[in-house]
Amino acid sequence: MADMYASLRSNVGTLGQILGETIRTNLDDAFLEKIEQIRQLAKSSRQGDEAARDEMLKLLTALPDNELVPFAKAFNQFLNLANIAEQFHTISRNCDELVCVPDPVEQLLGRVLSSNIDQEKMLDCLENLDIDLVLTAHPTEISRRTLIQKYASVIDILAALENPQLTEREKKQQHLRLRQLIAQIWHTNEIRNERPTPVDEARWGLSTIEVSLWQAIPDFLRQLNEQVEERTGKQLPTDIAPVRFSSWMGGDRDGNPFVTAKVTQEVLDRNRHTAARLYLKDIVVLVNDLSVEEANAELLEYTNNSLEPYRDVLKDLRQKLRNTVDYLNARLEGHSPEIDLSSIIWHESDLKEPLLMLYRSLTDSGMSLIAHGLLLDILRRIACFGIHMLRLDIRQDAERHSDVIAELTRYLGMGDYNHWDESEKQAFLLRELTGKRPLIPSNWQPSDDVAEVVSTCRLIATQPARALGSYVISMASKPSDVLTVLLLLKETGCPHPMRVVPLFETLDDLNNASSCMTALFAIDWYRGYTKGHQEVMIGYSDSAKDAGVMAAAWAQYHAQEELVEVSRQAEVKLTLFHGRGGTIGRGGGPAHEAILSQPPGSVDGRIRVTEQGEMIRFKFGLPKLAVQSLALYTSAVMEATLLPPPEPKPEWRACMQKLAEESVDAYRSIVRDEPDFVAYFRAATPEVELGKLPLGSRPAKRRVDGGIESLRAIPWIFAWSQNRLMLPAWLGAGEALQAASDRGEMALLQEMEQDWPFFKTRISMLEMVYAKAEPNLAKYYETCLVPENLHHLGEALRTRLATGIKAVLELTQSNALMEHTPWNRESVTLRNPYIDPLNFVQAELLARTRKEEEASTNVELALMITIAGVAAGMRNTG
């Protein structure tokens, strides 16, 4: 195993050694020796050496206050460097075949063309793919942007050091730069001093595009074009854009009072500003490239027979882009722009049409080779990013919209909308939607909360359609939730039909999703508004928190099947929007497998998926990584469309239904019905302390006074991953599998795992979570932190965990977890000796801070760093 990952281990060793030297330089030999001793004891403890565990605990609990922060920092930064080495390994020249699977698009094209699908159908599918990746802020994206940039530079150096042509002197220079970077990382505070604002989060999303995706999109499309040309002899269109990007950063106001209409306007301006600035950089380079004279008649006529026709057109574009950047700079700085507004880029066509004219001229003049360089890259960036860079979604809770109408109906003396039944609401909304008179009086002065919702709708009305994506209604459950938003958009003067998307989140709402959409499709006015296209969002986080992962997964699958069927009957094209998180408890996991495990017919060339916080960095943070991720998404959506999985057999459905029912009962018997559960959760995890971390712009709770129901899905999962019990990602599932086994259904479960991608993916995700769970560490937290009268609950939870692991091992016919995915197992094994000491210290620090009236600054900072370190080691936070 060690040989298989030799280059990975070598890089981990190099980075760890340099970190050690940095620590020695800044502290002393004795401290470094203590760190190394703890690391070795953690390794031995992992192999079952009880004496080593006791010795390690003795050292950790004896750490003086002044050593707590450097200790936590050392292990945290080692885990971050291990992540970097692993991330780099997947794109490294030395990557072994178990990690670097063959190119997924290449493989798929071969399979499709050797099946009975003809070439034209395949090309048509590829050219019409509509994959929309929606970047969302992540309240538990621990790493600061400053450090993320330094980590990216470390990867650049690891890549440079792989170059066999480097001279000894060049190698020395790279090693020196590596030492400098790791020293900078060591001396940088890894914990933010204050929460990021929604604008900070939006800027973080834009920086991912600038440093990675801006390059990755044309690189990926060039690679895709080569693969298609090799197989079919055909070229892809210049404006192909199988993958596009949207964002929630600065648009998602659900439970976030800091996302106001003013903030959304600033983010829209920033999106456009970043796009203009990056296009300007490209055009400046292109002016130098296109020094050629020969041109077709169209271009010569356009430039009055100029001697440098290409440059003349590009210089004009360059000036317009400069004016656009200046105009947006002035807006962002709060000045009135003193610029001729006719001389800036307002529409995508202002940028695209002149460039297309140059492209036609070059190809007509026998210079296709030149046309297919930077010029084609820019055209493909325009097809992907437009002039707004990201299409901004707006998201708000259904209740907030109802409150607007209710306040309005009370003001108008029509009664209280919130007290009407559903049929009364629909009748009123449709009457107003089809009527001509305005509903909102000019002298109406709404309350602050209502005014904010109305201001957001008024802002939408002023924006170009292409600057915006969907209006997502969270906690949607009935047709009136959708019609209410449509009425607000109409009343505020929205000139374009914005997509209004219900988000079905709880178990009940998922089960009722198809009947809600059936009712909407039955309304003629609504059918006319949608023009035969409907988007529906499936919520993963809240349904899993509500019902547990197994029952939620089946409800999501079943809801999608029913939505596909009602859309087919209504002759409506359905796009499903998957609100997945980074963790298993929030629908996370490998995107490729997740897409292929969707119900047959539910993808059909179109999909929207959220990409969150730290997962954006892991998948798209480097151009090469981003190209891999784009290829995975493209191949998965094509495969799900052209080669969909088989329909599940009736006996599989019946078994899955029973598993879902038993798992939700097992899950809720603890989370809802166990009277001591909330007290245990708050004591055994750092849930309360997490609220003090300056992580995201959004509050951790929907309501300050609420229990588990009011807690957002992300901190709920984050807290359990810190004490390593990982409870939300498995509770209920293992018990249901064991019950099925006890009924004699193990052979059926094994058949399902073998032949049904949906079930196989569920079991694979469960196996990964079980491998990351550490019952002994969770028990240590309990010993340190939980009142003795609640220990019985911890014992019961750990017994359930053991039951689940046993059931999964029997199902997969394995002796050890992740036996069939050695790369994932290696990844977990590599980190454990560094995470364990952080966990032990975290439990100790939690006990200290809870006993003391006021914890010392050292203790508080060290606690925050242990939280960051465990998150880095677990490779998923919430």
From Swiss-Prot:
Stored Pfam families: PEPcase
Cofactor dependence: Mg(2+)
Reported EC number(s) for this entry are: 4.1.1.31
The question of whether Nucleotide-binding is a record keyword is answered with no
Q: Name one process (GO BP) from the record.
A: oxaloacetate metabolic process
The record's PROSITE patterns line, in alphabetical order, gives: PEPCASE_1 (PS00781), PEPCASE_2 (PS00393)
Determine if Chloroplast is one of this entry's keywords.
no
Q: Which GO terms describe its molecular function?
A: magnesium ion binding; phosphoenolpyruvate carboxylase activity
GO cellular component terms listed in the entry, alphabetical order: cytosol
What the entry lists under InterPro entries is as follows: PEP_COase, PEP_COase_bac/pln-type, PEP_COase_Lys_AS, PEPCASE_His_AS, Pyrv/PenolPyrv_kinase-like_dom
Please tell me which top-level EC class this enzyme sits in.
lyase
- First and last residue of the signal peptide: none
Catalysed transformations (reactions): oxaloacetate + phosphate = phosphoenolpyruvate + hydrogencarbonate
Q: Which HAMAP family match?
A: PEPcase_type1
Query: What's its job?
Result: Forms oxaloacetate, a four-carbon dicarboxylic acid source for the tricarboxylic acid cycle.
| Family recorded in the similarity comment | Belongs to the PEPCase type 1 family.
From the Swiss-Prot or TrEMBL record, give the protein name: Phosphoenolpyruvate carboxylase
What species is given as this protein's source? Shewanella sediminis (strain HAW-EB3)
Q: Which gene encodes it?
A: ppc
